[in-house]
């Protein structure tokens, strides 16, 4: 997968290219991240990249010419078929479904805004899609861009040591992930659930599915509203709810 980034702070993306899963993917040649800085496309000695907005108001906007030239340079490097994405609070909110959709693209160009944003005409002429990572304000688009790169790279074949890791992540099937345990078996009087030590893979699968359903019901019940549960899932969720109610009653009596 090839990803181009338009940013005034390209050095921030070393967090993606030099570390962790994405860093290993870059070293293996599975992921390529290239950056273009609009400052490199300015024509004044101060390398100016911001200007005042028409109509007044607080803050500045990114200048059109350096930004457009940087986008055009990235497009030229990408060749045909690159999708240009602007990280924006006004964009579609990123979720796992969106990550899956974007991971199909082999070439992406991510535009990171700064200041109060970018000229609307640049959005109209250069941007294919706008995406947001949530309903809150950040200082720029770099962190959302890194979030996007990290999440979609997990779907690139070979990036993860075990592809099942991506397939079992939270939200992949519309549910939160189940609890996980490693050694020791007992930690401060808290034991690993016996079923995970049983070696019975069918029961382990059922336990994990039940916990995933239950955790979603407890923490993100709205996610269940859009799911058509199978008979097995419905039964397991009912079991979880009964067990949870019994536990609450027991704790209330203590």
UniProtKB/Swiss-Prot annotation:
NCBIfam families: PRK00026.1 (NF000648), trmD (TIGR00088). PANTHER family: TRNA (GUANINE-N(1)-)-METHYLTRANSFERASE (PTHR46417:SF1). Specifically methylates guanosine-37 in various tRNAs. It comes from the Bacteria. InterPro entries: Alpha/beta_knot_MTases, tRNA_m1G_MeTrfase_C_sf, tRNA_m1G_MeTrfase_TrmD, tRNA_m1G_MTases_N, tRNA_MeTrfase_TRMD/TRM10. Its main location: cytoplasm. One of its GO terms (biological process) is tRNA N1-guanine methylation. This is tRNA (guanine-N(1)-)-methyltransferase. Its EC number is 2.1.1.228. It comes from Edwardsiella ictaluri (strain 93-146). Belongs to the RNA methyltransferase TrmD family. S-adenosyl-L-methionine binds at residues 113, 133-138. The keyword Transmembrane does not apply. The keyword Kinase does not apply.
């Amino acid at each position: 997968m090839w990803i181009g980034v338009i940013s005034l702070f390209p050095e921030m993306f070393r967090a993606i290219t030099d570390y962790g899963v994405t860093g290993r993917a870059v070293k293996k040649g599975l992921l390529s991240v290239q950056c273009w800085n609009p400052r490199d496309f300015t024509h004044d000695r101060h390398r100016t990249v911001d200007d005042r907005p028409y109509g007044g108001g607080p803050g500045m906007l990114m200048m059109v010419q350096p930004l457009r030239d940087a986008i055009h340079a990235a497009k030229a490097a990408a060749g045909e078929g690159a999708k240009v994405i602007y990280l924006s609070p006004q964009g579609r909110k990123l979720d796992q479904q969106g990550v899956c959709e974007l991971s199909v693209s082999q070439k992406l160009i991510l535009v990171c805004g700064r200041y109060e944003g970018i000229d609307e005409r640049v959005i109209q002429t250069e941007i294919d899609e706008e995406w947001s990572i949530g309903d809150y304000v950040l200082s720029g688009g770099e962190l959302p861009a890194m979030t996007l790169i990290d999440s979609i790279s997990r779907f690139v074949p070979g990036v993860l040591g075990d592809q099942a890791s991506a397939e079992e992540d939270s939200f992949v099937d519309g549910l939160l992930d189940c609890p996980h345990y490693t050694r020791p078996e007992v930690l401060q009087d808290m034991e690993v659930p016996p079923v995970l030590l049983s070696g019975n893979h069918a029961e382990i699968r059922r336990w994990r599915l039940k916990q995933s359903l239950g955790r979603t019901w407890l923490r993100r019940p709205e996610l269940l509203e859009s799911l058509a549960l199978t008979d097995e899932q419905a039964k397991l969720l009912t079991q979880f709810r009964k067990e949870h109610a019994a536990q609450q009653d027991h704790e209330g009596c203590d």
